[in-house]
Amino acid sequence: MLKKFFIFIILIFTLTGCSEEQPSITVNIDGKSEIIDAETIYTHKEAVTFPAVVRSSGSRPVETEYKGVELTELFKTLSLDISNYDKIAFNASDGYRIILSVEEILEPSNVYLTFERDGKILKSKKLGGNGPFQLIIRRDPFSQRWIKHVDEIILQ
């Protein structure tokens, strides 16, 4: 009987481990949703690694390195012309939200959707990380508008 119990427990752990949801981002455009899976972002041909300084109140600045896709390049992949919009909202799984102007997003080498920090894939909030995706605004001098756990982009 004990042997059957252990087999049952192992089976449950195996099945729940296999059902883990893969990271993705929903892009809402004019009332229509498009889902971008993690693999599309992780393997994007325009993904780059860049230095950044993480600043947090009460802590010393930390030099780090992120890897991600510049938003303008990601939108090109989706055949989206964002110049027709005024602003773009970014929502996180923890309820946080920021809104950026299209002009700021169009600034070269400024706004990135990142998936790696210091060579390691960003972990989800559930696993204690800032991912699976984090929006980095390189010209934000105090990193106050960076948003972790990004799961939705809304073009407005």
Cite the ranges covered by each PLM segment.
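N-terminal intrinsically disordered, low-complexity segments enriched in P/E/S/T
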Residues: 18-156
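Sec-dependent bacterial lipoprotein signal peptides
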Residues: 1-16
